[in-house]
C-alpha cells in the first residue's frame, strides 16, 4: 500500500490527535482505561515505548511528556533517555512538562505549568518548577469538600462538556454566582 493510501486510510474520519495517539500506542506507549489526553499535548513520538500512562488519568491541554533529553548532546555527551511512568487517578494540569526518567505515583494532582523533574510519590498535590509537594491528596479533597458546602453547584444546569446547550439565562446566572469566587459542576 502506498504512503498516500495509508495516510488517507488512517486519517479518514479521525482527528490528527486521534491519529497521533494511535501511532504512539502502536509503537509501544501504554494508555490505561478511562484516560484522557486533551488537545495540544506533545508526547515524545521518538520513544513512545518508554511512556506508560495509567488508568483514570486526565492530561489537560498543552502538556508535554518527554522520554528523552537532548541537552547533554550540546557538550558531546549524547542524548539522555528515561522511562516516564504515570500512575492511576492522576490529573496533570495545562502546560505542565513531564521530563524523562520520572515516575508519578497514584492519586496525584499536578498543577498547571509545573515541571516534573523527579519522581512524585503517590497521594499528593504538586506544583511549581520544579514541582514540589503542596499537600496530601486527602488535604486537597477535604479543602474542596469544605468549599463545596459554601460555593455554587452547577450540576443542575449542565455538565461541563454540554455548555453549548446552556441558555443565555443559565450562563448569566453562572457568571453572577461566580463573581466572588469559584463554583463546582
Residue ranges and their predicted role:
Residues 72-78:
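Flexible, solvent-exposed loop segments that connect beta-strands
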Residues 17-22, 40, 45-46:
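Short glycine/threonine/proline-enriched tight-turn/helix- or strand-capping micro-motif at secondary-structure
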Residues 1-28, 131-185:
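Terminal amphipathic alpha-helical/low-complexity segments used for targeting or macromolecular assembly
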Residues 17, 67, 71-72:
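Short juxtamembrane and helix-loop transition motifs at transmembrane-helix boundaries
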Residues 33, 38-39, 44, 54-55, ...:
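Left-handed beta-helix
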Residues 47, 120-121, 136-137:
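Short glycine-/acidic-enriched loop or helix-start segments at secondary-structure transitions
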Residues 49, 124, 132:
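Glycine-centered loop/turn positions within well-structured domains
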Amino acid at each position: 500500500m502506498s504512503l498516500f493510501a495509508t495516510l488517507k486510510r488512517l486519517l479518514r474520519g479521525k482527528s490528527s490527535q486521534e491519529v497521533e495517539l494511535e501511532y504512539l500506542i502502536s509503537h509501544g506507549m501504554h494508555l490505561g482505561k478511562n484516560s484522557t489526553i486533551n488537545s495540544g499535548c506533545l508526547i515524545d513520538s521518538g520513544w513512545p515505548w518508554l511512556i506508560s500512562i495509567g488508568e483514570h488519568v486526565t492530561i489537560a491541554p498543552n502538556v508535554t511528556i518527554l522520554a528523552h533529553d537532548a541537552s547533554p548532546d550540546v557538550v558531546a555527551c549524547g542524548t539522555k533517555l528515561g522511562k516516564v511512568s504515570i500512575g492511576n487517578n492522576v490529573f496533570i494540569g495545562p502546560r505542565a512538562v513531564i521530563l524523562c526518567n520520572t515516575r508519578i505515583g497514584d492519586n496525584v494532582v499536578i498543577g498547571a505549568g509545573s515541571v516534573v523533574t523527579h519522581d512524585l510519590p503517590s497521594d499528593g498535590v504538586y506544583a511549581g518548577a520544579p514541582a514540589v509537594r503542596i499537600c496530601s491528596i486527602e488535604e486537597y479533597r477535604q479543602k474542596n469538600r469544605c468549599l463545596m458546602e459554601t460555593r455554587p453547584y452547577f450540576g443542575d444546569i449542565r455538565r461541563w462538556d454540554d455548555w453549548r446547550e446552556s441558555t443565555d439565562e443559565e450562563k448569566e446566572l453562572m457568571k453572577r454566582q461566580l463573581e466572588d469566587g469559584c463554583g463546582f459542576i
